[in-house]
Amino acid sequence: MAQQRRGGFKRRKKVDFIAANKIEYVDYKDTELLSRFVSERGKILPRRVTGTSAKNQRKVTTAIKRARVMALMPYVNED
């Protein structure tokens, strides 16, 4: 018995924002850039959500953590 494929949509590949814009150094003072990688509650978004490479995800994570220590970004964003 032949299997029928259901028509659906093809998922679009996520693009690494940092590599696409050729950002070499992720600065902890650039909170506008870092806020793209943080949820509305203040949690760091995983790679599968943001689409960043492993290397750039590590850079983003360390920059976010430094910004939190320097009080440039909140640890928790309570509304």
Curated annotation (Swiss-Prot):
GO CC terms in record: cytosolic small ribosomal subunit
Swiss-Prot/TrEMBL keywords: Ribonucleoprotein, Ribosomal protein, RNA-binding, rRNA-binding
GO molecular function: small ribosomal subunit rRNA binding; structural constituent of ribosome
Transmembrane region(s): none
InterPro entries cross-referenced by the UniProt entry: Ribosomal_bS18, Ribosomal_bS18_CS, Ribosomal_bS18_sf
Origin: domain of life: Bacteria
Gene Ontology biological process terms in this record: translation
Record text on subunit structure and interactions: Part of the 30S ribosomal subunit. Forms a tight heterodimer with protein bS6.
Physiological role: Binds as a heterodimer with protein bS6 to the central domain of the 16S rRNA, where it helps stabilize the platform of the 30S subunit.
Family: Belongs to the bacterial ribosomal protein bS18 family.
Name of the protein described by the UniProt record: Small ribosomal subunit protein bS18
Organism, as annotated: Streptococcus uberis (strain ATCC BAA-854 / 0140J)
Native organism taxonomy: Bacteria, Bacillati, Bacillota, Bacilli, Lactobacillales
Gene name of the record: rpsR
